[in-house]
């Protein structure tokens, strides 16, 4: 069965970001491969040796991949997309939202909406925008 997974790009702080996401999302970091670990026939500039070529985070319900931008490719930041998380309860959404907001920028405070008991938007300290839902509703409240 096909899977659709996000692949985030970073500018030298991928390892820190993925360790942060592992903790916040209660996930497991399965791969953290540096450019310096690539085969000898794939030369890497010394400036990129410690940067992450590929990171793979797994959770029972999703996977997240990431890497630092390759040598010679300028980092462009995240634009036009948002990662979204949906939790069964508003309390779970609040915990994750608060952790992502620490050192980040809240663009929409977590609050009740017609589609969820809680929804908010935040750009975390690594520049990744998130939408966090909790207690999804199938129909608007009356």
State each model region's role:
Residues 5-7, 82-84:
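Short aromatic/hydrophobic contact patches that present stacked aromatics
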């Amino acid at each position: 069965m096909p899977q659709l997974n996000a692949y985030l790009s970073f500018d030298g702080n991928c390892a820190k970001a993925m360790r942060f996401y592992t903790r916040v999302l209660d996930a497991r970091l399965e791969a953290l491969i540096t450019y310096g670990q690539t085969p000898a026939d794939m030369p890497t500039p010394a400036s990129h040796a410690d940067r992450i070529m590929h990171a793979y985070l797994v959770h029972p319900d999703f996977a997240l991949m990431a890497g630092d931008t390759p040598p010679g490719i300028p980092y462009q930041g995240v634009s036009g997309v948002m990662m979204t998380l949906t939790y069964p309860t508003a309390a779970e959404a609040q915990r994750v939202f608060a952790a992502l907001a620490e050192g980040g920028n809240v663009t929409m405070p977590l609050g009740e909406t017609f589609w969820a008991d809680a929804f908010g938007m935040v750009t975390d300290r690594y520049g990744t925008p998130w939408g966090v839902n909790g207690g999804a509703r199938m129909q608007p409240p009356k």
